[in-house]
């Protein structure tokens, strides 16, 4: 996979302010505010920054946490994981492997078959409905 690299100013020019703050500055959207939190549309969720496929809607579940949750990424190489010790917590941050956009965090409290919960900011995603 070829990495996409842009300056912060280039990202700022192509993203809206909330997308920029979350994807490029690692902010978090307010819980229950994202457009994909409750959607049930069948399709594939892509990175808003680079259009890389990230999650299949078949792995989405209602975790009640206020952000879209998935139990697995679309592929083993779709994202990278980074230890996050911000805000006095120890978590695992997930980023798009192609463009390094901050997506959210992964937690070990999800459903079978993986036991994982990828807690992802809606603003980082673009849902492409399945035809």
From Swiss-Prot:
Presence of keyword Metal-binding: yes
Cofactor note: Binds 1 zinc ion per subunit. The zinc ion is important for the structural integrity of the protein.
Annotated Pfam families: SelR
Entry binding sites for Zn(2+): 47, 50, 96, 99
Catalytic residues of the enzyme: 119
Coiled-coil ranges from the UniProt annotation: none
Biological process annotations from GO: protein repair; response to oxidative stress
HAMAP family to which the protein is assigned, alphabetical: MsrB
Protein name: Peptide methionine sulfoxide reductase MsrB
Organism expressing this protein natively: Pseudomonas fluorescens (strain Pf0-1)
Phylogenetic placement of the source organism: Bacteria, Pseudomonadati, Pseudomonadota, Gammaproteobacteria, Pseudomonadales
Gene: msrB
